[in-house]
Amino acid sequence: MRLGRDFYNRDTVTVAKELLGKVLVRNINGVTLKGKIVETEAYIGAIDKASHAYGGKRTNRTETLYADPGTVYVYIIYGMYHCLNLISEEKDVAGGVLIRGIEPLEGIEEMSKLRYKKSYEELSNYEKKNFSNGPSKLCMALGIDKGENGINTISSEEIYVEDDSLIKKDFSIVEAKRIGIDYAEEARDFLWRFYIKDNKFVSKK
């Protein structure tokens, strides 16, 4: 069942935790790709110095953070790598969840071509290990870039998230500090990174 607006229209930390175990769906090149979300990070603009919208900052880049809950926010790091976020909170309240890791479930052959430009069986163990265990890695595997920024997952067939009743939900959730935000003063110590314990597609234990 596809997640609706009410799922995202809540506290960002709650949404980040509850996205774990849900299935990210991407339709591209006539193929459906699916991955279980195994790692997330929460960002809350008003109080979070790690957020692009800290203190209510609104620019052309950050405007998507203020969009309807369930909207896709894609930004670029290091001038070349993309990161996928899902907007939370009410409209005009800047909150977002960074998707940091997914476990491939369906369409892995197409994912491999997008990620490495070769079939999955040709991949080395190192390439398989680094398939989708990081925000930019999963974007490459799913063919996500700035072109997907602003998509509404509530109605779009390109990208959305679903709750698959067949996926086990009896996992343990680890709470940890977020990654790569040492500049964010006290916010760098917030335990707003969440991941499924012992899942091999988590970017960092």
Curated annotation (Swiss-Prot):
Keywords, comma-separated and alphabetical: DNA damage, DNA repair, Hydrolase
Transmembrane segments: none
Pfam families in the cross-refs: Pur_DNA_glyco
EC number: 3.2.2.-
Gene Ontology molecular function: any one: alkylbase DNA N-glycosylase activity
NCBIfam families given in the database record: 3mg, PRK00802.1-1
Protein name: Putative 3-methyladenine DNA glycosylase
